[in-house]
């Protein structure tokens, strides 16, 4: 084969290889186009998923503490339908209290990232119950926890997390800047009320579904404050009560009616010689009942009941089983203030059943320790100190603190009545213990008409922490 033939042969082979390569590239392009067309066609014509529920789980490890960020069930083909919580039912008949939640946040906080907080409370929508709490802008076992015994500071915020979970930066939702707060759900959205600012000019900021909708300026310029527990929603309207004025004398008290976070009406109570602070409120047959703290002069608790037009009645729980702390020993009650040993107080609650009343109170008459529930069948209207049932919640030797009411609506439970529930704050740290911080965990109970247990469910944290030594 001469030189020209070799050149022609090599050229032919190269040409054939090039043509084959070109054909392969064209084939790849055609296959890619066909694949894209098939995928696009499938997206345009989605198939119906045979499963009714799809579950997504996101899990994160933080400082060797396992935190389940979310566990959300999504019903295929279904959306969350807003409703209006009616609030027209009566309270469910109950014979005792079943434990509902315990977050153990102080115990967990010795190792994990847990908020320093106080004033926890619980509120439920028609879909879930959440724990709300006032943080100090600090974590347990950290240097910024120093001095958090202080009630009011610019670092305090209202946050919330799923009920029963220890409140951490990884499972909590910011709600408002606040050192006094309330929150509730009307079936369509969350209303939050956060009070912050100077003692002589604080402002309450109202948010509906996270958006600022209204404000309330302090009208007496003496520490505007609100419930530290849930507000009440009935038929699309929500209600709260606020205090402005002295903590040890006659103050001013206002009822507020709100719709979608906007104030539509307010009135000032005509309540001489009464003192209302930190009211625990609940709905009952279309009305609102609030049981409050008298920090001025009473061992028993004041109440205010009002309808949706804010027409109200006021009084004190008549029972000789006194509910405040500090308080006198049980004895002769009064339908007005029981003045013996009545100065100072603690947030608390009661549930009215006709002439009877469930009274929640500390076991100690002088310190915030222990907790018990007492059923006085005539205690709302009669002044004797007899009662028919007592259920132990926290032992006398263990710390308690604030307590308050919340309810579960029929739209959540499927029952035909409103279930009464309560929470108890378990305060740890200063001023009673040798720490640099003050914080708390919480437990909650709900009323049932079946078997219950008397026991003690204390905070249980072993103090002091490393930061305190």
Swiss-Prot record:
Membrane-spanning segments: 13-33
Residues in the Virion surface compartment per record: 34-469
UniProt-listed Enzyme Commission number(s): 3.2.1.18
Keyword Thylakoid found: no
Residues at the catalytic site: 151, 402
Protein name (database record): Neuraminidase
Free-text comment on this protein's domains from its UniProt entry: Intact N-terminus is essential for virion morphogenesis. Possesses two apical sorting signals, one in the ectodomain, which is likely to be a glycan, and the other in the transmembrane domain. The transmembrane domain also plays a role in lipid raft association.
Keywords per UniProt: Calcium, Disulfide bond, Glycoprotein, Glycosidase, Host cell membrane, Host membrane, Hydrolase, Membrane, Metal-binding, Signal-anchor, Transmembrane, Transmembrane helix, Virion
Molecular-function GO terms, alphabetical: exo-alpha-sialidase activity; metal ion binding
Record's function text: Catalyzes the removal of terminal sialic acid residues from viral and cellular glycoconjugates. Cleaves off the terminal sialic acids on the glycosylated HA during virus budding to facilitate virus release. Additionally helps virus spread through the circulation by further removing sialic acids from the cell surface. These cleavages prevent self-aggregation and ensure the efficient spread of the progeny virus from cell to cell. Otherwise, infection would be limited to one round of replication.
Family affiliation: Belongs to the glycosyl hydrolase 34 family.
Compartments reported by the entry: Virion membrane; Host apical cell membrane
Glycosylated position list: 50, 58, 63, 68, 88, 146, 235
Miscellaneous notes: The influenza A genome consist of 8 RNA segments. Genetic variation of hemagglutinin and/or neuraminidase genes results in the emergence of new influenza strains. The mechanism of variation can be the result of point mutations or the result of genetic reassortment between segments of two different strains.
Post-translational modification: N-glycosylated.
Main localization (coarse): virion
Binding residue positions for Ca(2+): 294, 324, 344
InterPro entries per UniProt: Glyco_hydro_34, Sialidase_Influenza_A/B, Sialidase_sf
Amino acids binding substrate: 118, 152, 277-278, 293, 368
Disulfide pairings: 92-417, 124-129, 184-231, 233-238, 279-292, 281-290, 318-335, 421-446
Keyword check for Nuclease: no
Catalytic activity: Hydrolysis of alpha-(2->3)-, alpha-(2->6)-, alpha-(2->8)- glycosidic linkages of terminal sialic acid residues in oligosaccharides, glycoproteins, glycolipids, colominic acid and synthetic substrates
Region spans: Hypervariable stalk region: 36-90
Gene: NA
Activity regulation description: Inhibited by the neuraminidase inhibitors zanamivir (Relenza) and oseltamivir (Tamiflu). These drugs interfere with the release of progeny virus from infected cells and are effective against all influenza strains. Resistance to neuraminidase inhibitors is quite rare.
Region feature Involved in apical transport and lipid raft association, mapped onto this chain: 11-33
């Amino acid at each position: 084969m001469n030189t020209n033939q070799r050149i022609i042969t090599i050229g032919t082979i190269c040409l054939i290889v090039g043509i084959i390569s070109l054909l392969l590239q064209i084939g790849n392009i055609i296959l890619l186009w066909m694949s894209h067309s098939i995928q696009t066609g499938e997206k345009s014509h989605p198939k119906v998923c045979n499963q009714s529920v799809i579950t997504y789980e996101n899990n994160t490890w933080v400082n060797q503490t396992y935190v389940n960020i979310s566990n959300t069930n999504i019903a295929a083909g279904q959306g969350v339908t807003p409703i209006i919580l009616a609030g027209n039912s009566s309270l469910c008949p109950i014979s005792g209290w079943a434990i509902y939640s315990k977050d153990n946040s102080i115990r967990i906080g010795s190792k994990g990232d847990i908020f320093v907080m106080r004033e926890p409370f619980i509120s439920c929508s028609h879909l879930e119950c959440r724990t709300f709490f006032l943080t100090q802008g600090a974590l347990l076992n950290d240097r910024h926890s120093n001095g958090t015994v202080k009630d009011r500071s610019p670092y305090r915020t209202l946050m919330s997390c799923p009920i029963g979970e220890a409140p951490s930066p990884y499972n909590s939702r910011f709600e408002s800047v606040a050192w006094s707060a309330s929150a509730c759900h009307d079936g369509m959205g969350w209303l939050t009320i956060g009070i912050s600012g100077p003692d002589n000019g604080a402002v309450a900021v109202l948010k509906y579904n996270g958006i600022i909708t209204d404000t309330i300026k302090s009208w007496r310029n003496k520490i505007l404050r609100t419930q530290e527990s849930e507000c009440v929603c009935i038929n699309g309207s929500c209600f709260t009560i606020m205090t402005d004025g002295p903590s040890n004398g006659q103050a001013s008290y206002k009822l507020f009616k709100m719709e979608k976070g906007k104030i539509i009406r307010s009135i000032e109570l005509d309540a001489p010689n009464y003192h209302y602070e930190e009211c625990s409120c609940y709905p009952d047959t279309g009305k609102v009942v609030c049981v409050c703290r008298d920090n001025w002069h009473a061992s028993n608790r004041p109440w205010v009941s009002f309808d949706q037009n804010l027409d109200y009645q006021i009084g004190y729980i008549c029972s000789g089983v006194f509910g405040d702390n500090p308080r006198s020993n049980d004895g002769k009650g009064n339908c007005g203030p029981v003045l013996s040993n009545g100065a100072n107080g603690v947030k608390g609650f009661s549930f009215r059943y006709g002439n009877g009343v469930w009274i929640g109170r500390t076991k100690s008459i002088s310190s915030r320790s222990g907790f018990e529930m007492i059923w006085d069948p005539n205690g709302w209207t009669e002044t004797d100190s007899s009662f028919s049932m007592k259920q132990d919640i926290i032992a006398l030797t263990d710390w308690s603190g604030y307590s308050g009411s919340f309810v579960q609506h029929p739209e959540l439970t499927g029952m035909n009545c409103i279930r009464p529930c309560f929470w108890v704050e378990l305060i740890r740290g200063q001023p009673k213990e040798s720490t640099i911080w003050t914080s708390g965990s919480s437990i909650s109970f709900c009323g049932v008409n079946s078997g219950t247990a008397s026991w003690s469910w204390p905070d249980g944290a072993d103090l002091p922490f490393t930061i305190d030594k």
